[in-house]
Design a protein with these regions (language model features):
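Hydrophobic, membrane-embedded alpha-helices of multi-pass small-molecule transporters
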Residues: 9-17, 163-169, 179-245, 284-293, ...
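Membrane-water interface regions at transmembrane-helix termini and the short interhelical loops
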Residues: 60-64, 68, 126-149, 214-217, ...
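A generic transmembrane alpha-helix motif of multi-pass inner-membrane proteins
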Residues: 167, 370, 374-441
């Protein structure tokens, strides 16, 4: 049981852990200032709690979320939702973000300000060329490198956080940004969306189930018990890691010009490593981040191309891989800050829908739910998420007032009560559906 638990924990840790995730907690720490505690609580709630719960629920659904969504909502919605989701965790956001994170941490500190733009182009050309070639022939060597590097990288970050707490813990936090002053928990909650982990959990739940079954559980009870225990352990571990990184960012002295950029996480991670361990360790961190990001990039190109090739086989895997690599390369050259900025509206739409789907799946495990009621629930949540983005992006006063009038809007959860109402209606509306029973094969 203990061995299986450890192996399962490593699997879950590997699914969630990525170099890109490390830049958001210190950014939050720096920008939240004196409002750090409610801000990091919101971040952990969305970035860890929802992500781990989504994966756990996914591992209890043998056919994956695509089957659940097709059955409970509709096949066309499942295809559309998952296509947008894969594009988000693939070429539009995650793939270019891994490349720019590797560049910002590993290469950018070594270049003069005048050469950083050209440096990014040269780096991404080489980076994506190598990623593309390997994605055409994905090798298990990359998986093995990732399994070795991930725990070493995580250990380095833990040491950095502990030593950083002693070194900078006495430094006063900076003044919180306007967003955190207005709603610390809500802003932190939205920042947690940037980890993309809940979306990745939906996409890779079937892979997780297949891998877990190979561990040879003797019964369904043992399987489920292990999943829940390890899920709690992983959630606690990531919470501690995020809180530690956030605390480091909250007390690390960041220059005003860096703070104005809006995402000081890379600066904090790089500078803290150099100040605590020296320039050699900073170079080591750069190599670790670059290799970790690279293995992630290859994995995302492969998984996204395989998904679209499986759903739309008229186009070959190679064409998909080529297209997604080129898109990732083009977007990566916009820079890390730009990628994070334009990804937020899409995530503000995708995340509420994802959370609502998970809520429906959980409730349906215990009671039958009406299909029209489940469709209504997703429709309400989607409409509110779209209205929220349109209102804030285009300053449409009517939509902003409408969203702000909903319960929990200040916590960035205006869709929550409508989702609960929709699920309650699903208990009484006709055309009830039972949940699929999970069986060990």
């Amino acid at each position: 049981m203990a061995k299986k638990g450890a192996l399962t924990g490593l699997l879950l840790f590997g699914i969630f852990f990525g170099a890109g995730n490390l830049i958001f907690p210190p950014s939050l720490g720096a920008l939240s200032g004196e409002h750090f505690l409610p801000a990091i609580a919101g971040f952990v709630f969305s970035g860890v709690g929802i992500a781990v719960l989504t994966l756990i629920i996914g591992t209890l659904n043998p056919k994956g979320y695509i089957h659940e969504i097709s059955k409970k909502i509709s096949p066309w919605f499942a295809t559309l939702y998952l296509a947008v989701l894969y594009l988000s965790i693939g070429p539009f956001f995650a793939i270019p973000r891994t490349a720019t994170t590797a560049y910002e941490v590993g290469i950018s500190p070594l270049l003069s300000e005048a050469n950083k733009g050209l440096g990014l182009i040269v780096f991404t050309v080489l980076y994506f060329a190598a990623a593309y070639l390997i994605s055409l022939n994905p090798s298990k060597i990359l998986d093995r490198i990732g399994r070795i590097l991930t725990p070493v990288f995580a250990l380095l970050i833990v040491i950095l956080v502990v030593l950083g707490a002693f070194k900078y813990g006495g430094t006063s936090p900076q003044t919180a940004s306007a967003a955190y002053q207005a709603s610390a928990f809500g802003t932190g909650f939205l920042e947690g969306y940037n980890t993309l982990d809940a979306l990745a959990s939906v996409a890779f739940s079937v892979i997780a189930v297949q891998t877990l079954k190979q561990l040879g559980f003797s019964s369904k009870k043992e399987y489920i018990s292990t999943i829940w225990v390890v899920g709690i352990v992983v959630a606690l571990a990531f919470s501690a890691l995020y809180i530690g990184l956030g605390f480091l960012g909250n007390h690390f002295p960041v220059p005003a010009e860096v703070m104005k950029g809006g995402t000081p996480g890379v600066y904090i991670l790089s500078q803290a490593t150099q100040e605590i361990f020296g320039s050699t360790a900073q170079l080591f961190l750069a190599v670790m981040v670059t290799v970790t990001c690279f293995t992630t990039t290859v994995g995302l190109i492969v998984s996204t191309a395989e998904f679209f090739n499986g759903r739309f086989p008229q186009i070959s895997y190679k064409v998909y891989a080529t297209a997604f690599t080129l898109i990732g390369f083009a977007i990566a050259n916009l820079g890390l800050d730009a990628i994070i900025k334009y990804s937020v509206p899409v995530l503000v739409i995708l995340y509420p829908i994802t959370i609502a789907i998970v809520m429906i799946v959980i409730v349906n495990k215990f009671v039958a739910l009406s299909k029209p009621g489940m469709q209504l629930t997703i429709g309400l949540v989607t409409a509110i998420a779209l209205a929220s983005v349109l209102g804030s992006s285009f300053k449409i006063e009517f939509l902003e007032n409408l969203i702000n009038a909903l319960p929990f809007a200040s916590a960035s959860l205006p869709w929550l009560v409508p989702a609960i109402i929709g699920i309650l209606l699903s208990l009484v509306l006709p055309n009830k559906q039972e949940s699929d029973v999970f069986e060990m094969e």
